[in-house]
């Protein structure tokens, strides 16, 4: 920036008095030296009070390059300063800047008083009269009559030629971190703030104030364009506003606080206006009443982005994360930053905790990435909390919008405005937090809105960025246990939030890892699935035949990419090992050996190049789990036993499920030897490929069937090297065998198999109930309910299981896959039909499940209640 002695500064000359013709017959120049007419007493007194708090950096032209032939400030013509908005602090700062640069004072009126005010400055907008600490962005700006009076004075007096000098004032543009969060909160931004807030800004950040003088604008030249009076006024106001906006963008960055503008644009769209008219006609109400309802919806939804609040939140949460977490690790963000420029970015993270919202925003901010507009459930729109989340970029949507067409269209148009405006987005396609640790089946609503918005205005290419968030301990762990035990979900409450904050701050939650997955370019997806689309914009109501399929493909691809960027932390490895035993306990040596085997599988047979694995040794992993109170050590003369007690065992199933997909192939191979001592390679691979579509649908696996077969082959080779299996040869027909005795190798093989055991039990329950009831008896929903009941009963009779074992959603996914593969299909009454192929699948289960377990499942499989004969 130019310094005080910069050539851009006006020459240090003092205006001198010249003759004035009050009739307007002579050329008007600056009339009186400041030494002749003193500034008002109140200005001198307040200026002395404010001076110690101010340190001005003067920028006559700032960083915008203007032509060298611009009229200088001291050419003798009268000057009127133009501020962006009124305010006593602004007036005193301007006066000090003028004295510092030897320019005429804004507090001394011009001869003839063309402004009809006792001053030589005007403002485009009035500052809010509110004394609130919160910036007023909804209140409208009101322009003064001074500019209109000045133009009228020029029309009356032909020789009058006043120059307007726009002056931009920025208090606390970039306060240092050492200044504290309170100073950051009151730094300069785009909001029109009240008097009290401006005063606090001066007291806290006044020593970092920038005053930007722009080149003068000749009012006479503007009038000489010959436009009608109203158009001249509007044009001059528009030019000045554009100037102030350009300077503000240069100094403090672009305006992201566009809530009012977005709401106005949403309500002005053709789709919303038609929806308002349709709703009013349907309800028999007045158009204005329905319009107000649509406006209320828009304000309920819209974010209220505020840079000072975001900077304050960063300052606050830096301390919070350091207190409760042992670090936040971010992987693969550099490759994302190389790919993202020029794209409309949509962040699509996994959803495990309410902390996801805050944590990801914190990580992006720390990486120097502009925060996105984040979709949040309306349940989080709590007093105080909701306001803060809005100001950090959150916009709120209702959980269910079915049947509310007006709300649906307002929401859709709001998203379209964000996409068209180039704002990045963030939403969780699972719809809600996963209570089981698995990725939930995706919901395509937000993807559909994003895709439709892009197709309407395909300006910038869209990039979906999958993100995996991994925790070692959940803040919501206790509430998840209650919900999985059958208790209803507790409604979010501001009081419960405040009550829980001290408890949370006393706990240690281990380390958090944020992994950026491989991004998905929307244009590449459209080129594959919609080759007939050639980049042309579509109409609002146009829905091509390929749209729904594209949304579904995108949703599954996002979940698959999230899983392909998983992080394996110490708790994941402990969960895989300990939950494979009946009492969730192992000797220390056995636990170390099992963790070592799991790490070897991950490192020697990498799932993808974005999966990260903890570098800690098994011994360090065990010590870490003891530190955060997950493991209990029981001392014994024959060797210590490490176990998980009570609720921790159920919570560990959550962390096992986080990484279940990484061990799919190895768990499949191990499962085949749980109840069989010998099996050929070709049979093992054939059965695995037959089971793969169901595993892929449930776990979002990335391979094709051929790739999965190759992965199984690699697992077999690793198990042979580790001594877990014995091979009679390398041919497909050659048998693979395991030891008959209860060796350490057999123990480790059984432990690996346990992670997929419950999935196969669910599959067999579904097939058993279908076969027992016969074709044409059960609908899909009836089958789901019976499967859930059978799984609950099996859990009570046979062995304790994790709560997700009888999750209806998992059964629903399996039944849906059966339908996709045409193994079952509905009749005209929506009852499921099947043929002998289902019996073949049941026979294949004999390879995986033991005889006793199969018999128990067949015995408890319920039959549908048949209606009593008439």
Swiss-Prot record:
Domain of life where this protein originates: Bacteria
Region (Disordered): 1-27
Compositionally biased tracts (Polar residues): 13-27
GO cellular component, one term: plasma membrane
UniProt keyword terms in alphabetical order: Acyltransferase, Cell inner membrane, Cell membrane, Lipid biosynthesis, Lipid metabolism, Membrane, Phospholipid biosynthesis, Phospholipid metabolism, Transferase
GO biological process: CDP-diacylglycerol biosynthetic process; fatty acid metabolic process
PANTHER family according to UniProt: DIHYDROXYACETONE PHOSPHATE ACYLTRANSFERASE, GLYCEROL-3-PHOSPHATE ACYLTRANSFERASE
Domain note: The HXXXXD motif is essential for acyltransferase activity and may constitute the binding site for the phosphate moiety of the glycerol-3-phosphate.
Protein's UniProt name: Glycerol-3-phosphate acyltransferase
The organism of origin for this protein: Xylella fastidiosa (strain 9a5c)
């Amino acid at each position: 920036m130019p310094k005080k002695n910069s050539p851009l500064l006006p020459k240090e000359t003092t205006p001198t008095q010249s003759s004035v013709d009050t009739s307007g017959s002579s050329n008007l120049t600056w009339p009186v030296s400041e030494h002749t007419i003193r500034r008002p007493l109140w200005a001198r007194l307040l200026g002395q009070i404010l001076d110690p708090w101010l340190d001005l950096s003067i920028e006559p032209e700032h960083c915008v390059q203007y032509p060298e032939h611009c009229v200088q400030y001291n050419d003798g013509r009268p000057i009127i300063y133009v501020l962006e908005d009124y305010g006593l602090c602004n007036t005193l700062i301007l006066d000090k800047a003028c004295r510092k640069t030897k320019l005429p004072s804004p507090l001394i009126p011009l001869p003839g008083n063309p402004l009809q005010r006792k001053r030589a400055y005007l403002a485009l907008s009035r500052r809010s009269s509110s004394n609130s600490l919160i910036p007023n962005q909804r209140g409208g700006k009101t322009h003064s009559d001074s500019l209109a009076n000045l133009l009228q004075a020029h029309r009356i007096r032909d020789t009058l030629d006043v120059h307007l000098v726009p002056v931009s004032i920025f208090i606390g543009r970039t306060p240092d971190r050492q200044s504290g969060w309170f100073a950051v909160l009151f730094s300069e931004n785009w909001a029109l703030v009240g008097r009290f807030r401006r005063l606090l800004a001066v007291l806290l950040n006044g020593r970092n104030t920038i005053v930007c003088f722009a080149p003068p604008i000749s009012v006479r030249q503007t009038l000489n364009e010959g436009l009608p009076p109203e158009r001249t006024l509007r044009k001059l106001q528009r030019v000045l506003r554009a100037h102030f906006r350009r300077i503000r963008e240069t100094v403090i960055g672009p305006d992201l606080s566009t809530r009012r503008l977005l709401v106005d644009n949403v309500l002005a769209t053709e789709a919303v206006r038609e929806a308002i008219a349709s709703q009013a006609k349907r309800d028999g109400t007045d158009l204005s009443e329905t319009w107000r309802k649509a406006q209320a919806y828009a304000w309920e939804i819209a974010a209220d982005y505020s840079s000072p609040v975001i900077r304050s939140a960063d300052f606050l949460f830096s301390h919070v994360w350091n207190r409760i977490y042992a670090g936040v690790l971010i992987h693969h963000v550099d490759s994302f930053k190389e790919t993202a420029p020029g794209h409309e970015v949509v962040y699509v993270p996994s959803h495990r905790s309410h902390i996801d919202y805050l944590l990801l925003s914190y990580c992006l901010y720390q990486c120097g990435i502009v925060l996105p507009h984040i979709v949040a459930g309306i349940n989080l729109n709590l007093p105080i909390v909701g306001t803060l989340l809005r100001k950090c970029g959150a916009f709120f949507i209702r959980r269910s919008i079915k049947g509310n067409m007006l709300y649906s269209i307002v929401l859709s148009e709001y998203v379209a405005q964000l996409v068209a405006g180039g704002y990045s987005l963030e939403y969780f396609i699972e719809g809600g937090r996963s209570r089981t640790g698995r990725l939930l089946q995706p919901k395509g609503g937000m993807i559909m809105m994003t895709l439709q918005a892009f197709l309407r205005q395909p300006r910038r290419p869209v990039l979906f960025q999958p993100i995996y968030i991994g925790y070692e301990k959940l803040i919501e762990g206790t509430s998840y246990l209650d919900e999985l035990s059958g208790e209803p979900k507790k409604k979010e409450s501001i009081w419960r939030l405040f009550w829980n904050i001290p408890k949370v701050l006393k706990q240690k939650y281990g380390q958090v890892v944020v992994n950026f997955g491989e991004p998905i370019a929307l244009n590449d997806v459209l080129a594959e699935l919609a080759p007939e689309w050639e980049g042309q914009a579509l109409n609002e109501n146009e829905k091509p035949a390929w749209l729904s399929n594209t949304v579904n493909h995108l949703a599954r691809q996002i979940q698959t990419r999230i899983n392909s960027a998983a992080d394996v932390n110490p708790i994941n490895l402990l969960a895989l090992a300990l939950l494979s035993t009946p009492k969730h306990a192992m000797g220390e040596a056995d636990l170390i050996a099992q963790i070592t085997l799991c790490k070897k599988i991950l490192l020697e047979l990498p799932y993808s190049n974005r999966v990260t694995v903890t570098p800690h040794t098994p011994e360090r992993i065990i010590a870490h789990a003891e530190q955060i109170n997950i493991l209990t050590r029981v001392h014994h003369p024959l060797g210590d036993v490490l176990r998980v007690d009570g609720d921790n065992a159920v919570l560990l199933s959550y962390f096992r499920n986080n990484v279940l997909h990484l061990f799919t192939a190895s768990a499949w191979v191990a499962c085949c030897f749980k109840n069989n001592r010998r099996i050929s390679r070709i049979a093992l691979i054939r059965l695995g490929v037959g089971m793969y579509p169901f595993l892929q649908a449930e776990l979002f696996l990335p391979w094709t069937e051929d790739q999965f077969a190759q992965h199984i082959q690699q697992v077999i080779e690793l198990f042979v090297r580790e001594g877990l299996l014995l091979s009679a040869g390398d041919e497909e027909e050659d048998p693979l065998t395991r030891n008959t005795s209860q060796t350490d190798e057999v123990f480790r093989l059984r432990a690996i198999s346990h992670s997929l055991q419950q999935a196969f039990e669910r599959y067999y329950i579904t097939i058993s109930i279908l076969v027992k009831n016969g074709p044409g008896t059960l609908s899909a929903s009836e089958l789901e309910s019976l499967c859930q009941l059978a799984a609950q009963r099996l859990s009570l009779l046979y062995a304790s299981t994790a709560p997700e074992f009888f999750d209806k959603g998992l059964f629903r996914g399996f039944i849906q896959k059966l339908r996709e593969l045409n193994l079952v299909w509905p009749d005209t009454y929506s009852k499921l039909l099947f043929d002998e192929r289902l019996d073949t699948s049941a026979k294949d289960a004999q390879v995986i499940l033991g005889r006793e377990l199969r018999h128990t499942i067949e015995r408890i499989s319920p039959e549908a209640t048949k209606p009593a004969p008439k």
